[in-house]
Amino acid sequence: MQLNELNCVILCGGKSSRMGQDKSKLILKNQNLTQFQVDKFSKIFKNVYVSAKEDKFENHFSLIKDSLEFEVYSPMLALYSILSNFKNEFVFVLSVDSPKVGENELLKMLPFLEQNYKIIIAKTPLHKHPLCGFYHSSLAQTCKNFLEKNEQKIGLLFSEIKTKFVEFEDEDAFLNLNFYEEYEKFKSKLK
């Protein structure tokens, strides 16, 4: 299996409460963070989609909207909505605010898709990264079951589903732009 046979979905539906503004629209290199991620991953994957609660991008991207079945704002709902759009395949899911993840990290995770796992995510010494990994579309119903019990954390899947945590030493590769200062620092290094 090759990366260019797979689909990628960039999650853009977070509340961005710590950032104080919508992270998906932060500007990097004369484009918003969403466009930055879509451009990068379009060179790697078969298709790149954007996941959000509504179309805040004026039809600029292939959009997967959150299901209206549940009136919550959560990563589990986004994952359920994403996986419901695919049949019998792995999908790479990444948060829009992780701009340093790239092909090297993906290639290290890729071989585990051929093994008996349904979830393959990145893990660094300090964190598991549930919004940086491959999820099999067959998990949509499991996500729905959690939502019906009002369970919103993606990490709950790991105890029920065969999951591979792919070890990475470099925390920096999985930088999340949660605060404006982190964004400013990252932006200044791009110049």
Curated annotation (Swiss-Prot):
Cofactor(s) this protein requires: Mg(2+)
Keyword Transcription regulation: no
Record Gene3D superfamilies: Spore Coat Polysaccharide Biosynthesis Protein SpsA, Chain A
Cross-referenced InterPro entries: MobA-like_NTP_Trfase, Molybde_CF_guanTrfase, Nucleotide-diphossugar_trans
EC number(s) stated in the UniProt entry for this protein: 2.7.7.77
Superkingdom of source: Bacteria
Catalyzed reactions per annotation: Mo-molybdopterin + GTP + H(+) = Mo-molybdopterin guanine dinucleotide + diphosphate
SUPFAM superfamilies: Nucleotide-diphospho-sugar transferases (SSF53448)
Keywords: Cytoplasm, GTP-binding, Magnesium, Metal-binding, Molybdenum cofactor biosynthesis, Nucleotide-binding, Transferase
Residues annotated to bind Mg(2+): 97
A Pfam short name: NTP_transf_3
Intracellular or extracellular location(s): Cytoplasm
Function: Transfers a GMP moiety from GTP to Mo-molybdopterin (Mo-MPT) cofactor (Moco or molybdenum cofactor) to form Mo-molybdopterin guanine dinucleotide (Mo-MGD) cofactor.
Family according to the record: Belongs to the MobA family.
Name of the protein this chain belongs to: Molybdenum cofactor guanylyltransferase
Species per Swiss-Prot/TrEMBL record: Campylobacter jejuni subsp. jejuni serotype O:2 (strain ATCC 700819 / NCTC 11168)
Gene it is expressed from: mobA
